[in-house]
Amino acid sequence: MLTNGLISLLAIAGLATNAFAGPIRKVSNAGAAGAIADKYIVVLKKGLSDSAVSKHTNRISSFHSNVARDLTGARAHGVGRKFRFSSTGFNGYVGGFDKATLQEILNSPEVDYVEQDTVVTTYAEQTDSTWGLDRISHEDYSAPYTYEYDETAAGAGTTVYVIDTGIRISHDEFQTVNGSSRATWGFNSVDKTDSDGNGHGTHCAGTIAGKTYGVSKKAKVVAVKVLSAGGSGSTAGVVSGMNWVAENATPNFSVASMSLGGSKSAALNTAVDAIFNAGITIVVAAGNENQDAKNVSPASAPNAITVGAIDSSNKIASFSNWGTLIDVFAPGVGVLSSWATSDKETKTISGTSMACPHVAGLAAYYISASEGGADPATITDKITSSAVSGQVTGNIRGSPNKIAYNGYA
């Protein structure tokens, strides 16, 4: 799971420290699994004006450039990417800082909290089979597999933002009859290459909106690249991508899909809340650690639709996270979809990463069937209330016994 450090803006009058700003605070998530050395997410207090934020960041940058002595290279780059979610006032920045600068930030009155950045990764595993579309379109299902859905809706008029490794937008799965693509690029916090070097994001996008493998075959998908070709990234990079989505998506007609995760992060969960409050339905993978989803982010965010994985016999997948924060289960074992190595390539893989886009596609499907769009709370209720109950087998350990369902057959 990728977790990048967001660093709040701290003002440094000259080189004077804020020694009397209040009680000494500590960095949250310090030493957490996947912690990235010397990288932090700084979250600023709500209500700060743009000028106050700039004054703070300028002061911290000045302090850092004058006192940073124990770090070299990229680890000591200072104040990096800033973020601001206008829907909630959640704002701050990320960066790499030495110990002295970190303490100056912690002592700054403008700062709400500082969180150590952590690694975020995809939730996928290789395996084999095709059955997911049948499962989510039938209350009771069996081979031969068919997909039943309302073709007049099918995600028309909706956009799903795939926060992942990117999308091969030229893939046949996204091409229309007039030769255009329903897939486009939106944001890239990883590098300067707008391509999917991993395949994971293309696979998820295909399950969401592919013309063969997709739940919502008329939806548009937008690549929000926050993970590298190796399938990992940082919390800071993920939050930056979420910030872009929150500021650019159309409320009540948009879905964010996040098949990734890492250590529990207050910053990442707060970004989920900001997306939700911006009118964007957000669907996330539960995680592949076979543990309580409350321990990881963004699966632990209350405003996310958190999706666990089942296999084709309706049994909870051996790897799937579980617990009361799960909202629904969806197909996540042996899922066939598009792949990024060519415009016709496909691949069968498993993971809660594969379950998540089934439900993201379902969210788009339900939005398109609603006149005038639908807000995240309405779509969350629709997905959980329409789910098939009582069919998940295995030890679900407090998870709701619900399988995502489009209510069609």
UniProtKB/Swiss-Prot annotation:
Disulfide-bond pairs as recorded: none
Residue stretches making up the Peptidase S8 domain: 130-409
Keywords linked to the UniProt accession: Collagen degradation, Glycoprotein, Hydrolase, Protease, Secreted, Serine protease, Signal, Zymogen
Subcellular location: Secreted
InterPro entries, per the entry: PCSK9_ProteinaseK-like, Peptidase_S8/S53_dom, Peptidase_S8/S53_dom_sf, Peptidase_S8_Asp-AS, Peptidase_S8_His-AS, Peptidase_S8_Ser-AS, Peptidase_S8_subtilisin-like, Peptidase_S8_subtilisin-rel
Keyword Amino-acid biosynthesis carried by entry: no
Domain Inhibitor I9, first and last residues per copy: 39-122
GO cellular component: extracellular region
Broad class of where this protein is predominantly found: secreted
Catalytic residues, chain numbering: 164 (charge relay system), 200 (charge relay system), 353 (charge relay system)
One Pfam entry name: Inhibitor_I9
GO terms classed as biological process: collagen catabolic process; proteolysis
Signal peptide per UniProt: 1-21
Family: Belongs to the peptidase S8 family.
Name of protein: Cuticle-degrading serine protease
